[in-house]
């Protein structure tokens, strides 16, 4: 952050400041976030987000009018959204690796048209809060949420097309 602040005195070019932020600051804020993100409290999440908010204020300078508007202008996501996207991407990549296949066991009844069982992956059950907030159950829940979203999108698509699936992309 100090480097970003110093550079902001020499240049007002937002792309240069964004490059410094993305390469020097954001990487430190997100390092190994797929492991520790699920265990964050709301206060810790706000503290981490506060760092990005300060960086965005430095980058925007006098044109800063609010955090959400600045994120849209700079085409940035909140750090929480980025951590969720990275965790989902990590979980999907892990499904393809044989050594991680046991972390995400499939339900026996899970196939595309099953409506009785809403979850595709078995979420490990535990009585301890520490395990419930750890990475593996969090990633399992994240995969289930993504699976349900895809299933709803497919159902909506089939309803729109009256059950006929077209090869042409929908615009």
Spans of model-derived segments:
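Hydrophobic/basic alpha-helical segments
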Residues: 1-171
């Amino acid at each position: 952050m100090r480097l970003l602040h110093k550079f902001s005195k020499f240049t007002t070019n937002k792309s240069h400041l964004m490059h410094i932020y993305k390469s020097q600051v954001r990487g430190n804020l997100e390092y190994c976030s797929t492991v520790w993100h699920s265990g964050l409290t709301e206060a810790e999440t706000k503290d981490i987000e506060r760092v990005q908010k300060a960086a965005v204020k430095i980058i925007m300078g006098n044109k800063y009018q609010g955090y959400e508007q600045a994120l849209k202008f700079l085409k940035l996501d909140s750090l929480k959204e980025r951590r969720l996207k990275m965790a989902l991407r990590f979980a999907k990549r892990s499904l393809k690796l044989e050594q991680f296949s046991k972390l995400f066991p499939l339900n026996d009844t899970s196939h595309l048209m099953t409506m009785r069982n809403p979850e595709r992956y078995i979420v490990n059950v535990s009585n301890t809060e520490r395990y419930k907030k750890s990475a593996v159950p969090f990633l399992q829940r994240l995969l289930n949420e993504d699976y349900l979203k895809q299933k709803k999108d497919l159902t909506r698509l089939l309803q729109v097309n009256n059950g006929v699936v077209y090869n042409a992309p929908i615009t």
